[in-house]
Design a protein with these regions (language model features):
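Short internal beta-strands
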Residues: 39-46, 223-227, 356-359, 378-387
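Residue-level signal for inorganic ion chemistry
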Residues: 33, 80, 121, 150, ...
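Phosphate-binding loop of NTP-binding sites
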Residues: 72-77, 84-227, 231-240, 257, ...
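C-terminal helical cap/extension that packs against the catalytic core
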Residues: 55-56, 371-429
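Nucleotide phosphate-binding/pyrophosphate-handling subdomain across enzymes
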Residues: 4-16, 26-36, 144, 276-380
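Beta-strand->loop->alpha-helix junctions that form or flank phosphate-binding loops
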Residues: 41-45, 66-69, 104-108, 240-259, ...
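Short beta-strand "acidic-cap" motif of Rossmann-like dinucleotide-binding folds
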Residues: 39-44, 147, 169, 245, ...
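N-terminal leader/targeting and accessory segments in enzymes
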Residues: 1-105, 109, 394
Length: 462
């Protein structure tokens, strides 16, 4: 085992450690620190009754529970782990830092201790798919891959089993990046557009958080940037190591791009890697995801392996996922559509005919005006639900091409009603897609729960 890892766990023995939030991802961490001799407190807004067996399990581990609305009061522990979605600048955390506490996160500690090469992906859209493609490419090349961050499972509990020749592939959100003080060996930024402004407060803070992925890189690091996105292209001057671009729209002098004849090409070598039509998962956005992933692994994974993976990898659940075909109607789950740009670049770019779209959800305080014209062009029936329904309707009706009834707009009070309305109005040959253009937090704990509920309802149709 790496000496840094041994020294770290020796240092936490007897220390008081708090975990703020008892989600499924924190449970292995809590168990690990308790086993290493830390004095652990688990804090959560939920009651013991709501936590159920989890509360019993933690108590049996000797973990102190602080529950209820005041779960962040009296934060006096030596080390405090915040969950990725918890605001870094919360007054309670700021006060704890002022009193000498170390406020950190699972990913921060993992980056400090990880003995192997780290690939990390961030961006507004395409993070999970790009991260998954990188992991698939490296596995196919014979690497032992540890997948984590916002995808997979917590990696810190595995730290003692990770070998120097392994690779870690992680997806990082702006919430995770905002406080990180170490950068990956290979950093990928897929794109940037307004998102999470309910948490960050301004687009500038959101951009700065994302840019932190490359802030601490060295001369032998690699950064992969989207040349087609003005914001990510603007990161170029901050790159300290190797800089690679990817582009779907124009050639790159150094990077990976889609040539006008349909070939994905590496520059400056001119290597023809594969044709875009060979990629199994559909959509222009997935071509971009492959461009980014190929740039990340170039020099480690051969073109032959890249082609093999592209032809066989079926993608990630909740991303334009075909649920079933019923009476000639195709139902797709694109619950990952958590922002207008995701829905525009995903669902609204995939189908040749106008579709039935279920949209709406939690309000992240981001503008919907770009969504309006895309809905008018690609949607024949728009079914709206959730807190953002009025804003989306207003954006659609304000679009230049909108005419009354084109698209038709209906409102639903629940997912059950939305699916029922779609089923009632769909005809043979239609596509029905859930792609909300919003987060799920007003009705569901996460986009996976929302997508799974949609799939259950669609499977129950007859």
């Amino acid at each position: 085992m790496d000496n840094r890892i041994s020294a770290f766990f020796a240092s936490v023995k007897g220390k008081t450690v708090a975990f703020c939030g008892i989600g499924g991802s924190n449970l292995p961490l809590i168990r690990m620190f308790a086993d290493k001799g830390a004095i652990v407190t688990a804090r959560d807004r939920r009651s013991a009754e709501a936590l159920g067996e989890t509360a019993v399990l933690l108590s049996n581990l000797g973990v102190k529970l602080v529950l209820g609305d005041a779960y962040l009061s009296d934060l006096t522990e030596d080390i405090i782990f915040r969950t990725p979605g918890m605001k870094y600048g919360l007054p309670e955390l700021t006060a704890a830092r002022a009193h000498g506490a170390v406020v950190t996160s699972e990913m921060e500690v993992f980056f400090d201790l990880c003995p192997c090469k780290i690939y990390a992906v961030t961006g507004s859209d395409g993070k999970t798919t790009t991260t998954s493609i990188i992991a698939e490419l490296l596995r196919a090349a014979g690497k032992t891959v540890h997948l984590g961050g916002n995808i997979g499972h917590p990696l810190l509990p595995d730290i003692e089993t990770i070998a120097p020749d392994d690779v870690a592939v992680v997806e990082l959100s702006s919430f995770q990046l905002i406080s990180m003080r170490k950068s990956p060996d290979v950093a990928v930024v897929t794109n940037l557009s307004p998102n999470h402004l309910d948490v960050h407060g301004s687009m500038e803070e959101y951009i700065d958080a994302k840019k932190n992925i490359l802030a601490h890189q060295g001369a032998f690091s690699r950064t992969v940037l989207n040349a087609d996105n003005a914001i990510t292209r603007g990161f170029a001057d901050s790159v300290r190591g190797e800089r690679m671009f990817f582009s779907r729209l124009e050639p790159c002098a150094y990077g990976v791009f889609l040539r006008t004849d349909g070939w994905i090409v590496h520059a400056p070598s001119g290597t023809e890697i594969l044709r875009a039509e060979e990629i199994k998962i559909p959509g222009l956005h997935n071509i971009e995801n492959y461009l980014a992933a190929i740039a990340a692994v170039w020099g480690t994974v051969s073109p032959e392996i890249i082609r093999s993976v592209a032809r066989t990898f079926g993608g990630v659940p909740h991303r334009a996922e075909l649920v079933r075909v019923l009476d000639g109607v195709s139902y797709y789950n694109d619950s990952i559509g958590t922002s207008p740009t995701r829905t525009i670049r995903g669902t609204l770019s995939l189908y040749p005919e106008k579709i039935i779209l279920i949209a709406g959800g939690y309000d992240k305080k981001i503008p919907f005006n770009p969504l309006g014209p895309a809905v008018v062009e690609h949607v024949k029936l728009l079914i709206l639900m959730g807190a953002t329904a009025p804003k989306i309707e207003a954006a659609v009706k304000a679009a230049a091409g909108y005419r009354d009834g084109n698209p038709a707009i209906l409102h639903a009070a629940s997912m059950e009603e939305a699916v029922s309305l779609a089923h009632q109005h769909a005809q043979t040959g239609d596509v029905v897609s859930l792609s909300p253009a919003c987060a799920s937090f007003d009705l569901y704990p996460n986009f996976e729960a929302r997508g799974n509920h949609f799939k259950q309802l669609v499977q129950a149709l007859s």
